Amino acid sequence: MHVPVLLEELILALEINPKGFYVDLTLGRGGHSLAILEKISNGKLVVFDKDQDALDQTRPKLLAYKQNIEIIWSDFSRFDFYLENLGIQFVDGFIIDLGVSSPQIDDPERGFSYSKDGNLDMRMDKSQKLSAFIVLNEYPYEKLVEIFFKYGQIPYAREIARAIINSRPLKTTFELVNLVKKVIPALVLVKKNFIKNVFQAVRIEVNNELDSLQKLLEKLPKFLKQGSKVAIITFHSLEDRIVKKAFLDLIRKDKLEFFQKGLPKFSMKVFRPKANELKSNPRAKSAKLRLLLKNR
């Protein structure tokens, strides 16, 4: 069962207007969206997901709110195209949860989990060609090293890349796990789980996650009006750094007007999971919610 992370904090922070317009760019299993739909009577919610399985499994839960919802299958970096086609100029609140959902992790055939044996897949959108299998079996040594350094921050990037080249073809997640265990000393793995970082690096490459996030952040401001909010939940330092920089750039750009008018155009708040949430949902441990507010 998928438990939405930081749900209470997100709903309170959004201060939902019953007649407002909201966009959930990562529908997943619908936890955040359903909480919003319960609070908008005459409002509208547009939801996106690039994972067709997520849309198929979540759609039945949303039928009771069909007059308030629009469901779109797309990568979130193209959200502006769809909103403009719907005639939408401004949005009261954006919700983006950058985590991999529990059903995705728990399905061995999706290849996201290093604790379950399955195919080397890792595609969020199963219609795309690039998969973990292609990355690990066709990428040259230099490209693998770059991925492991850039997206996994792994000090053993060269050794892992060399071992992958020498062990091809790799077909399953456990083959990759066992390869990493042979390369990285056991005492090092006890202190830091670099297997997780290897899987993260490959997943980011397969799904073009950070580039898509950067494009999304560049497009968001034109849809914000006074009172609009953007809530983004991150799960690792790479994506959080990108979100933080984008938010701070908007805040700093307005410094002169701030001194003249006394109210910053943008401001930011940060929320972390409470102890009771961490106890019931350990996967929330690394989650961080950044909220951008447009004040004027």
UniProtKB/Swiss-Prot annotation:
PANTHER family: 12S RRNA N4-METHYLCYTIDINE METHYLTRANSFERASE (PTHR11265:SF0), S-ADENOSYL-METHYLTRANSFERASE MRAW (PTHR11265). Belongs to the methyltransferase superfamily. RsmH family. This is Ribosomal RNA small subunit methyltransferase H. S-adenosyl-L-methionine binds at G30, G31, H32, D49, F76, D97, Q104. It comes from Mesomycoplasma hyopneumoniae (strain 7448) (Mycoplasma hyopneumoniae). It is found in: Cytoplasm. One of its GO terms (biological process) is rRNA base methylation. GO terms for molecular function: rRNA (cytosine-N4-)-methyltransferase activity. Keywords: Cytoplasm, Methyltransferase, rRNA processing, S-adenosyl-L-methionine, Transferase. One of its GO terms (cellular component) is cytoplasm.
